[in-house]
Amino acid sequence: MIGIDLDVTLLNNRKLISPKDLNILKSAYEKGIHIAILTGRNEYSTKLYADYIGVKSSIIANNGSIIKMENGSTIIIDIEWDKILEVIKCAEILNLHYNLVTTEQIYYHRKPLKHEIFYGDNDIANHSDVVKYSIIESLEDIKDLDEKAFKLHILDDNTWRINKFLDKMPYKTDFDMTKTPENQLEICHKDASKGSALKIIADYYDISSDGIIAIGDSGNDLSMIEFANIGIAMENGMDIIKKKANYITKSNEENGVYYGIKKFINL
């Protein structure tokens, strides 16, 4: 099985999949290798890219909060509503920007920041971000919602405030938290991560961990890089990923996915 991240891994900086990367994934699938796409993106956006790749694949969205098998079987791991509201309250006290991803839409605190939105010059990227969203002023606007929450983003350009939030954040042990290169925290249920999702898929299809390759670049890829028998980091990836990986491939602008897979699989 090949588990692969989307942004800054399979996708280049324009949100395109290169022909080389696309073809090697198709070749792997034709050889009987299961393909799993694991991303922090929402399910709708992820499925558009999966459809473009053109092979049956498992889809893992919102950092492992939604796991959809090839046959459509779906596992949802949502956050307890009361607990996430307490976390949001902590963020508001520190005047931090946040957004909340639910079953229905994305709730942006005040307004979306530029780096919260994916930009691209191709049809997939443009369509993949047409997602319903609302602007809220405070948690008072969402506290009584009847929706399931999957992921909370905490964002700020000031690292000190982010660290202060981590010191004060309630229910830390109930969540899985990862940091992105854009200085934002991604907060999900403690049982929702790319690594745990990859294990669920492997168990479902009876795939040994010895037969798993994971490719990623960012903090939310760490758990799957550690779980896989072979963890591949992108050259443009975070240092923590490179240190844990078995191999560092070329960047997302240089067909890194192609060269990483070719290194370990004869296709």
Predicted region positions:
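Active-site metal-binding loops of divalent metal-dependent hydrolases
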Residues: 8, 41, 64, 216-218
